[in-house]
Amino acid sequence: MRTLTLNELDSVSGGASGRDIAMAIGTLSGQFVAGGIGAAAGGVAGGAIYDYASTHKPNPAMSPSGLGGTIKQKPEGIPSEAWNYAAGRLCNWSPNNLSDVCL
């Protein structure tokens, strides 16, 4: 994964307004929660979050699964059942793939 620079982000159409949008959302959220003081704090927080997100390099270990880049990807053309069986996983597949469970 390649990290974009601020110059690259700003060169995208509308990219320069990203920080302004983040600050506006923060201001509106803060105002909703705590009135005028919340609006001021929310705007500052929105800008700080944008600055952090635009310069931060993602850490694969912080992925939702907690496994990051340690999981091998299934090669193309191999059925999921065969891939999981070869890896020693016993999987129960649901028809709509919403509640698949692998042990």
Curated annotation (Swiss-Prot):
GO biological process, one term: defense response to bacterium
The keyword 4Fe-4S appears for this protein: no
Keywords per UniProt: Antibiotic, Antimicrobial, Bacteriocin, Disulfide bond, Plasmid, Secreted
Location in the cell: Secreted
Stretch forming the signal peptide: none
Proregion span(s): 1-15
InterPro entries given in the database record: MccV (IPR020280)
Residue ranges crossing the lipid bilayer per the database entry: none
Repeat is among the record's keywords: no
UniProt superkingdom: Bacteria
Disulfide bonds: C91-C102
Pfam families: MccV
Its job: Colicin V kills sensitive cells by disrupting the membrane potential.
Name the record gives this protein: Colicin-V
Protein species of origin: Escherichia coli
